[in-house]
Amino acid sequence: MAEMRLKPEDILKRHEIALTKKEDFRSLYDEAYEFALPQRNLYDGYYDGKVSGSKKMNRVFDATAINSTQRFANRMQSGIFPPHSKWCRLEAGTDIPADRKDEAQAALDVYTEKMFATIKQSNFDIAVGEALLDLCVGTCVMLVQPGDDVTPINFIPVPQFLVAFEEGANGQVDNVYRRMRLKGESIEQQWSDAKIPADLKKKIENKPTEDVELIEATVFDTKRGDYCYHVIHKESKAEIVYRRMKYSPWVVSRYMKVAGEIYGRGPLITALPDIKTLNKVLELVLKNASLAIAGVYTAADDGVLNPNTVTIAPGVIIPVARNGGPQGESLKPLPRSGDFNVSQIIMNDLRMNIKSILLDESLPPDNMSARSATEVIERMKQLSQNLGSAFGRLINETMVPLVEKILQIMDERGIIDLPLRVNGLEIKVTPVSPLAMSQNMDDVQNILQYAQIVQQAGPEGQMMLKTDMLLDLVADKMAIPQSVRNSQAERQMMKEQMAQQAQQVAQEQPELAGQIAEEAIKQGGVM
């Protein structure tokens, strides 16, 4: 089958079109980053102007949004991707035959252990924390690449300012374009198969440490089903790197989407009016405070008082022509108008609104009564309910693609041998993070309540319950690994051994035969 290979000019054109569509979000994202994530703000010319180390909080007067955004990212990470913990489980899908499911699940549990051992060796916990900060604005982007023997996988959180993308079928992100700067001498180190044109090579030899503007493009080949990877030198429009890839290394996640848009809108966009209002109110309060301290004065033009040399400070003597009389004072304070005490009420309301939108509703302080496990679970449940559809989108657009790419890299490096696909039918990714488990525990409680009702209904009720399947379901909901559970074959063997022992006891003590038969009937109904 013929492969699709775009020319460098075509890639640059598509990149410009994608950037033009993204410009519609520039003013919206710019304000969100300026007031809530100023340290990650690249929209105010800091990147284009190549200015590093600049102050980015000149217009920020209140840090409520900054603090709540950080707490939002921390809560999302602890609830969905808890550091140094397992946050998902690989499970056998519906395409796996029932008689092979226990065997497949045991192997997948081993792969799950190896996957999280690999993740712990990487920078995942740091990278996902930074990516979730961008997700609070609306769109986060992460690059998953093979590493070395020490760090098998590298996770790179890319600021979404540098990335433009295109959607394909079913609203999935297919093509990703990234602007990047790299020292000329590092190009061949970054891409060992780079083909540098003569003009660029000469420029690098003269100025090896000067940054080179590059466009990195990952384009989906709709005919072959794989990806084309290009690195283009923007100035000369020369293709430096071209590769074919089985999968895209990009993970692009949107918190929430509006119909007809491809970029996300996060809780910061919702809270932005309150954030800007709070910032302006506090700015006015500070200005009012400075007026209250220093004051504003009127001075008579009498030739004695020189306003340009007057210093308002404790202990200073100001020479004036008069302090009263028919003509009035030479220097007189200008009375202030307005009462800014009401601003405290307004600011408190605005801060509460911002924290509520950003899910920054903390547990009670440590000096209050001890928090029970039930309270923590209920608060996790409330958090998952508040997230709503965003939680499902995070699983589908972030967790599942991440796991898929991690397993593919591990398979390529020989860490595992994975003949199955992560498609939900052969292998499915089941979240076991605290947020997901809070939902599962609701199901477990319902199952156990039903079992209690059945037990109270007597023998007829017990005959309706399949105890072994019930316990399997509870174990799956609680993410109990297959290695500590007996398989169907092992259970059948244990039943046969128990039946033989019961038969032997019945032969030795005939008076117990009736009891054994009754118990066997009861067990048969329950099992």
Task: Give a label for each model feature.
Residues 68-80, 111, 115, 123-135, ...:
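Short, Φ-rich (hydrophobic/aromatic) sequence segments
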Residues 94-98, 111, 257, 261, ...:
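Generic signal for short, ordered secondary-structure residues
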